[in-house]
């Protein structure tokens, strides 16, 4: 059972359902851990997860996982679904008979948070379904201080779930036996039909929103009535007494036993920071980051075999003629050993990993074809519209390749893939944005889980984000993946942020992600115009040996006077202008990995270019964006010189809305860095 819930009742669930020792909870209240033993930053007790193997009445052992989550209500919903789907895929459980996602919601959040609808919409989609989710709504008839009339425009908080046409049960929260009956009915429905089911437990919050809150300020009449009501354990005890099921002495004995247990557990507490407990399938994965280069080349003979398999349409399959021609050109470049473009290198990286037994899951909006019509991982018959997936036809023994066009969602879809990555550390799990600009629709998932999950909860992830990035005159919402925001989230090695400039570098980067002994999220600024740029190609030899290089240096032919450091596609414009002007005094350095900052590589380079009088950082993003503010202090400390900024001036918008203005600004940047057009 994969369980997600907010903070209310969380400690109760941990100790009474997942059987977490009371003594561990007492230690969390005392905050008495040795600071020297603390790993990462930690989190408050109401956010931490837990998992255990619980033996139920019939002797069956059920693994129960309560996911760690942030205070942002409902944000954990798609994470639960993703982890559940990963476990189902690993267990060969497509109908969800062995793995059950269970979500506990609040009434105000279920009606109000948009991510709920995004998660519900995944329920029956091929790439996301988990055999149905059981939703339990703790309906306290209030959201902090907000009454239902101000919290939703529908009669019931559950009405958003009507989109799925599934059962919604409303049950009285003071009737435990009725609630149990409904839960059994809900689970039977889910098991038989493989769909979601919703249980609305109509109850109340006895105290305020938190330990120090006073509800009488805003709901005096409601809380007068609540405080007149006996607690539910008293009501249920009285019902059992009335039916002569138990005696008063037995009830008192139970109460005494609970209090004695709590006292004993409090006395026995030993507040030692708990050791990491990983989910299944994490054996052999290291937590420590290393900048040691990982050999990721693939022998030419094997790449040729793989290229023929992924670029050959089977007999009898009527593929679109333009696609057949495209695949033919891809194969031709591999056979010639030169001119391998971005999509071709990606396909070869995927094929090589799959043939080595490493599964791949690739999702995103329009990702099968690719936003820029570059990938074509799924071919569609012109006669029957049946699909053929070349990367699933590599031969016996290959790993599973899953490519799905996602629903039109960023936050929910990215949260799902983050959850999936928690359950499949040995695979390459990728989420691609349609344009990198749209990643801010999922900013909560990036901030709360991807960037900080390991620090807060010791939950590493190897998720890869592919974010098309680069100014090309397409306006402010089709230009920037907000590189600067990812860099602001970087603290040491929590995120790998890369901006590769060649297909070979991308090839090695993808392979490195699953070949290195640890797992860290990888954020890749991917290209748009470079997908078809005549200079953005690699040779077969570039793929057959070597590794991903965090820094690429291209020195001039003469004495170096100025060093231009940049990252991303602008390097090709700088190279072209340098050639046009025969500016042999310029050295060009490409920062392919921005974080963790490649200090060693740049130190060595600075030593070789010690004669340079000037070091410049060149970027096409505005001065308050891009990598400038992250790179400036680090680069200056290495070269022991002032680093000059060359780029657009600061701007509220990431790019101009008019193509002509873009061209004028871009030319000004290139001219300042290298010189005006000859």
Residue ranges and their predicted role:
Residues 1-115, 120-153, 159, 164-169, ...:
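Conserved internal helical-beta-strand scaffold that buttresses enzyme catalytic cores
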């Amino acid at each position: 059972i994969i369980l997600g819930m907010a903070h209310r009742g969380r400690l109760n669930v941990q100790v009474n359902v997942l059987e977490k020792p009371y003594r561990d909870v007492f230690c969390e209240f005392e905050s008495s851990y040795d600071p020297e033993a603390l790993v990462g930053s930690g989190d408050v007790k109401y956010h931490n997860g837990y998992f255990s193997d619980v033996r139920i009445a019939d002797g069956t052992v059920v693994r129960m996982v309560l996911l760690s989550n942030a205070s942002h209500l409902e944000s954990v919903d798609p994470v639960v679904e993703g982890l559940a789907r990963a476990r189902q895929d690993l267990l060969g459980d497509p109908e969800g008979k062995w793995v059950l996602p269970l979500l506990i919601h609040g009434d105000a959040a279920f009606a109000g948070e948009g991510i709920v609808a995004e998660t519900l919409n995944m329920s029956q989609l091929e790439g996301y379904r988990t055999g149905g989710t059981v939703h339990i709504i703790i309906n306290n008839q209030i959201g902090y201080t907000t009454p239902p009339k101000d919290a939703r425009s529908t009669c019931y908080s559950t009405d958003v779930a009507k989109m799925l046409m599934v059962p919604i049960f409303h049950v009285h929260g003071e009737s435990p036996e009725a609630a149990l009956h409904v839960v059994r009915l809900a689970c039977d429905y889910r098991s038989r039909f493989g769909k979601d089911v919703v249980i609305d437990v109509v109850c109340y919050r006895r105290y305020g929103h938190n330990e120090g809150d006073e509800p009488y300020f805003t709901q005096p009449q409601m809380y007068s009535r609540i405080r007149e009501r006996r607690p539910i354990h008293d009501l249920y005890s009285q019902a059992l007494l009335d039916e002569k099921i138990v005696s008063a002495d037995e009830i008192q004995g139970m109460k005494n036993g609970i209090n004695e247990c709590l006292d004993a557990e409090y006395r026995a507490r030993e507040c030692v920071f708990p050791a990491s407990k990983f989910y299944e399938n994490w054996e052999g994965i290291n937590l420590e980051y290393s900048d040691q280069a990982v050999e990721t080349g693939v022998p030419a003979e094997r790449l040729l075999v793989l290229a023929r398999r992924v670029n050959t349409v089977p007999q009898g399959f009527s593929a679109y003629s333009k696609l057949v021609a495209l695949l033919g050109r891809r194969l031709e470049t591999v056979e010639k050993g030169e001119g391998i473009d971005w999509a071709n290198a990606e396909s070869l990286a995927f094929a090589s990993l799959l043939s080595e037994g490493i599964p791949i899951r690739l999702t995103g909006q329009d990702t099968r074809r690719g936003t820029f019509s570059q990938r074509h991982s799924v071919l569609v018959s012109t006669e029957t519209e049946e699909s053929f997936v070349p990367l699933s036809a590599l031969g016996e023994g290959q790993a599973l390749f899953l490519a799905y066009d996602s629903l039109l969602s960023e936050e929910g879809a990215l949260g799902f893939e983050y959850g999936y990555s928690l359950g499949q550390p040995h695979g390459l799990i990728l989420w691609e944005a349609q344009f990198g600009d749209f990643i801010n629709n999922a900013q909560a998932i990036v901030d709360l889980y991807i960037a900080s999950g390991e620090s807060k909860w010791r939950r590493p992830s190897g998720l890869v984000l592919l974010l098309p990035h680069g100014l090309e005159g397409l306006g402010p919402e089709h230009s920037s993946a907000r590189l600067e925001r990812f860099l602001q989230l970087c603290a040491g090695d929590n995120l790998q942020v890369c901006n590769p400039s060649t297909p070979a570098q991308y090839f090695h980067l993808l392979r490195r992600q699953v070949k290195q002994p640890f797992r860290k999220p990888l954020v890749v600024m991917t290209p748009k115009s470079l997908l078809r740029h005549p200079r953005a190609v690699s040779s077969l030899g570039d793929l057959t040996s070597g590794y991903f290089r965090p820094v690429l240096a291209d020195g001039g032919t003469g004495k170096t006077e100025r060093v231009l450091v940049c990252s991303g596609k602008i390097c090709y414009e700088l190279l072209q202008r340098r050639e046009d002007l025969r500016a042999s005094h310029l050295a060009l350095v490409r920062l392919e990995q921005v974080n963790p900052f490649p200090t060693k590589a740049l130190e060595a380079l600075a030593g070789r270019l010690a004669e340079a009088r000037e070091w410049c950082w060149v970027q096409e993003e505005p001065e308050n964006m891009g990598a400038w503010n992250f790179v400036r202090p680090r680069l200056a400390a290495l070269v022991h010189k002032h680093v000059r900024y060359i780029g657009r001036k600061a701007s509220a918008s990431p790019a101009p809305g008019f193509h002509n203005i873009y061209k004028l600004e871009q030319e000004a940047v290139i001219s300042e860095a290298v010189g005006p057009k000859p």
